[in-house]
Amino acid sequence: MEKKSLLILGTASHVGKSSVVTAICRILSRSYRVAPFKAQNMSLNSWITKDGKEIGIAQAIQAKAAGTEPTADMNPVLLKPKGDCVSQVVLLGEPYADKSAGQYYDSIEEMHAVLKGALERLWKEHDIIVMEGAGGAAEINLYERDIVNVGTARLTKAPIILVGDIERGGVFASLYGTIALLPEDVRKNVKGFIINKFRGDIEILRPGLKQLEDKTGIPVLGVLPHFKLRIPSEDSVSLGDKEDSKAEKEIEVAVIRLPRISNFTDFEPLEGLVKVRYVDINEELGNPDAIMIPGTKNTVNDLLDLRASGMDKKIQAFKGKVPIFGICGGYQMLGRTIFDSGVENGVEAEFEGLGLLDIGTRFGEYKKRTVQVTKKVNGYGPILRPIDGEEIKGYEIHMGVTDSNRTVFGDDGAIDEDGFVIGTYLHGLFDNRNIRNALVRYLYEKKGLEYEPDEAISENDAYEELANVVEQNIDMEKLFEIAGV
């Protein structure tokens, strides 16, 4: 069987590679068995597969758009920054080691072998693999050690489409410059350009498109308009686009922007219903209607930073006044104590938590729990009482064990005696419509406002919406020809 593949590279981070791959996966899935692939992903937003493997959330979304089950082979190397130039390396969905950049690059040959195995397994089960690069493709200082851009291109010999973002300016220079800097053996496989996030009259753009084509000999396949994506974000680069979102809403939820924040996508389902404001630990907390403490790649260090900034006292002052939620590392911080045997911070020590929940957490070994779960709501307190006994789904990605005397979702989490401080290990909590509506309804009614339960767009509708935008603005016949389908 012919090993068909298509590689989507970008001129920089956050130009739209992930969304383009998602759309192409959706479109091709109508006629072919499609798998997404990203050799190496650096992200703190991750997903747990059905068999308990951890991959980047973007590849999970792309797999769902393609109508296939997410697997670890779709993102064989996941790098999760921990700070101080060290990342946790997750290999085929399992924690492998904490490595500095230099240590990681020393093991690059081992990574190449992992990629080859993953690709071979995907090709056995699928007709075509739609692959995604990372950041900018023309990182000339990394060519000999790269596995995700030039490395993937050389490994697969795949036809390449290069994506540029016009919103930030300089798109023609970035596309032309990337082509000029790519090695010749990779450059010759670039078969098309896509310009993303355009606002305005496309006729004004056409002279530039023609000049770009004339100078490079590469066709522009289309120009995608700027539009609101209704699928989760991949990385913290996009957090900057959220800070003033939904300013017209009367209800404000403050998400503490921890220095090592992870899985901030947990709060995206709230954005259409309330103003979600991401608050740096050195900023004023203001007067929010609810507070969220998110996950983190290092609970202990972020707790220490929270305390050094004085944000801990600001959060504690809201106990009993507004709902306070902690998810994963945020849940651990809400407790009385955290004992670290050296797993988190390198030395054995006990740390005082925020003291808002009667729990204690222990980091005893370098072992991560990764699992998809279904739980029942223990409807204690005014927020959760209306949905007592209802089911919710989520996934866990955490180290450490927490002891709780008053659980909140089955055997998970904790809730205080008033029902206003809630902690859980469950990522994807607010993806559950019942939880989302229970919280937002409470916040609205507390302010004397009428709330109509949201009818969130389904995942499938979101994928179709994205695919339709791409189909309407891209030369799909040419794209199919490039992909060989």
From Swiss-Prot:
Keyword terms: Cobalamin biosynthesis, Glutamine amidotransferase
Transmembrane portions of the chain: none
Domain GATase cobBQ-type: 250-435
Pfam families for the chain: CbiA, GATase_3
The keyword Metal-binding is annotated on this UniProt entry: no
InterPro entries: Class_I_gatase-like, CobQ/CobB/MinD/ParA_Nub-bd_dom, CobQ_GATase1, CobQ_N, CobQ_synth, GATase_3, P-loop_NTPase
GO molecular function: ABC-type vitamin B12 transporter activity; catalytic activity
Pathway involvement of the protein, from the record: Cofactor biosynthesis; adenosylcobalamin biosynthesis
Catalytic residues identified in the record: C328 (nucleophile), H427
CDD domains: CobQ_N, GATase1_CobQ
GO-annotated biological processes: cobalamin biosynthetic process
Family: Belongs to the CobB/CobQ family. CobQ subfamily.
Function noted in UniProt: Catalyzes amidations at positions B, D, E, and G on adenosylcobyrinic A,C-diamide. NH(2) groups are provided by glutamine, and one molecule of ATP is hydrogenolyzed for each amidation.
Name of the molecule in the record: Probable cobyric acid synthase
Name of the gene this protein is made from: cobQ
